[in-house]
Amino acid sequence: NKAADAVALFDVVETLDREKLARALAEAAMKRGRSPRVLVQVNTGAEPQKAGVRSDQADDLIATARLTYGLTVEGLMCIPPAGQDPEPHFKTLSALADRNGLAVLSMGMSGDYETAIRCGATHVRVGTALFGERNRP
C-alpha cells in the first residue's frame, strides 16, 4: 500500500488531498510508530484534471486530518492553473494557511517563484530554472 510505503520512507508527505488518504496515513503511522508531517494539496483553480482538495473544502480537510486522524499538518501546497495569473491562487493559499495556523507554503515554480515568494512561499520548486527544460521523448 502506497500510504504505508510513504510513512516508512518519507519525513514529509506533500500531497494530502482527501480524507481517505488521511485515514490510510494515520493507520500506517500507527503500525509503524512514526508519522510523517503532511502538506495539504489545494486545487486552487478547481481544475478537474488536477488532484487536490478544493479551496472551499480545505479548512475541513485540515481539521479532519488533525483532529480525527492525529496527523501533523505542517502546511499547504498548490500549482496554479497554467496560463492564469498565479497571484490570486498564491494569496488564496496564504489566507488558508493563516486561518489554520500553518507555517509552510509550497507554491511557485520556475516561472512564478518571485510572485510566490512575495505572497509568502516558504518552499518553491525551481527545477527548470536550475537544470533547464526536460528532454521529453
Regions found by a protein language model. Name each.
Residues H123, R136-P137:
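Active-site loop ensemble at the mouth of alpha/beta enzyme cores that anchors a bound cofactor
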Residues N1-V104, M109-G111, I117-C119, F131-E133:
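Conserved alpha/beta-domain cores
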Residues G120-T122, G127:
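Active-site-proximal glycine-rich helix-loop-beta segment
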